Structure formats: structure tokens, C-alpha cells
């Protein structure tokens, strides 16, 4: 983050932790429950299930990929956790609609671009997806077939193997 802290997923304990610049370690999300509850409340009291990829957004918030909950969550700078993408059920769908209502399956990693959009690997759907600044989800690469990236094809018809 902007203070120089390092964040990491502690999947085994269902928590996300921060190492401060002084070396102190603190929990920033998850109460240890292997569950997915607590949206709208304190991130420290929420269940965080299978935390994986992490990113600090341009808003200073921490974004957490939850692989087995099939969603992406956000911890704002005040410590409140909320759902950013995924309806919590494994599946695929929702392009052109709100990301919080979309079906995603096994999200894995994410990154922000300079326009503040989120790109993430919808790994078990073999797709790369985007959440725009209005909260709308789009598929930008891949389709449901498993395979290898084929050079020279248009990005929306390429085949990926668990990106």
C-alpha cells in the first residue's frame, strides 16, 4: 500500500494479514471462520473463505479474491467489507450486468489498470474478465474450452487453461 505495508493471504486460517513497515503483523480481514459472511460489517468479524489474490485499489481499499466463495470482496479504508463481484455460486454469466450479480467460478488473481478497472482471472471458467468503474462485468478473453493460448487469434476467441 502507499505506507509500504505488505499484504498476504493466510488461506489456512481464513484470514488476510498485513506486515507493517515496522515488521508488525496484523489481521486486516477474516475472523478465522471458513465461511463467507459479514458483508457490510467489520472485515475483522467477517468470514473470509479461501482468500487468494490481493490488490490495493486506486481508492486505497484492499481487494480480496475468494476462490471457493466464487467472488471478489473489498475492504475499504475504514475496515468495512463488501462484495465487489460474484453472486457466491459457482457459474458463468452476467456479462453486461452488475458484477455483484454475476456468476464467476474460482477467481484467482486480479490487477487494476490505469483507468481503475479491475481485470481478474475467472480461472475455472477459463476466462479473463473485467469489472469497469461502474461495476459492470465483461469477458475480455477466453471461452469455456480448456486449452492453450493460440497466438494470432482475436482475444475473445482464444483458449486458456486455467488463467
Question: Model regions: which residues?
Answer:
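Residue-level detector of Asp-centered blade-edge/turn motifs that repeat once per structural unit
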Residues: 1-3, 56-59, 112-115
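Short loop/turn segments immediately following the C-termini of beta-strands
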Residues: 11, 67, 123
Amino acid at each position: 500500500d502507499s505506507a509500504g505495508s505488505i499484504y498476504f493471504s493466510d488461506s489456512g486460517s481464513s484470514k488476510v494479514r498485513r506486515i507493517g513497515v515496522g515488521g508488525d503483523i496484523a489481521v486486516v480481514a477474516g475472523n478465522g471462520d471458513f465461511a463467507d459472511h459479514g458483508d457490510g460489517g467489520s472485515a475483522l468479524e467477517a468470514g473470509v473463505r479461501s482468500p487468494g489474490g490481493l490488490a490495493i485499489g486506486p481508492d486505497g481499499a484492499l481487494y480480496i479474491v475468494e476462490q471457493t466463495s466464487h467472488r471478489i470482496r473489498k475492504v475499504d479504508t475504514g475496515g468495512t467489507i463488501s462484495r465487489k463481484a460474484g453472486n457466491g455460486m459457482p457459474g458463468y454469466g452476467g456479462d453486461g450486468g452488475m458484477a455483484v450479480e454475476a456468476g464467476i467460478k474460482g477467481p484467482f488473481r486480479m490487477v487494476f489498470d490505469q483507468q481503475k478497472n479491475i481485470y481478474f482471472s475467472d480461472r475455472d471458467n477459463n476466462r479473463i474478465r473485467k469489472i469497469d468503474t461502474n461495476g459492470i462485468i465483461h469477458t475480455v478473453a477466453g471461452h469455456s474450452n480448456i486449452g492453450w493460448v493460440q497466438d494470432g487469434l482475436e482475444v475473445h476467441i482464444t483458449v486458456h487453461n486455467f488463467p
